Amino acid sequence: LVTYLQEVRKHQGFMVPGPAQAAAVAALSDQTHVDIQRDRYRRRLESLVEVMAAVGVDVPMPGGGFYLWAPAPGGDAWGFARRLADEVGMVASPGEFFGEAGSDHVRLAAVAGDERIELLRDRVGI
């Protein structure tokens, strides 16, 4: 049985090839890309917080991730999402998409490129 399993293992690709292992070591040993991406998302989130302040909504910076949860004025997340789309050109998801607890919020993702976020800033006059 052991001989058979050794033969099966040899042909099943259970071993990661040496070049792939070396590439993984190189990719994981330098965290510069993590710092760059974290800073990029932080800047985008800060800009979105300012955009929301310009439309009269106070949104705290998140402790992690790249989403902002903005309270919907009057608790109307659908109406607020429409308002952001119509007045600012910003896409927001009504919080109820993500569970009942978010029903009076909208979720904003800081995934648009910097130039798109700058356009939002221009639209609200900041």
PLM segments and residue spans:
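Conserved core segment of the aminotransferase class I/II
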Residues: 1-42
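A general structural signal for well-ordered alpha-helical segments in protein cores
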Residues: 2, 20-21, 77, 81, ...
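Accessory recognition modules or surfaces
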Residues: 12-15, 24, 47-48, 68-85
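Conserved glycine-rich beta-strand-loop-beta hairpin in the small C-terminal domain of fold type I
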Residues: 21, 25, 41-49, 59-71, ...
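Residue-level recognition of strand-loop junctions within catalytic nucleotide-signaling folds
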Residues: 29, 73, 111-113
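A short linear hydrophobic-aromatic micro-motif
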Residues: 55-59, 91-96
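PLP-dependent enzyme catalytic core of the Aspartate aminotransferase-like
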Residues: 83-92, 98-126
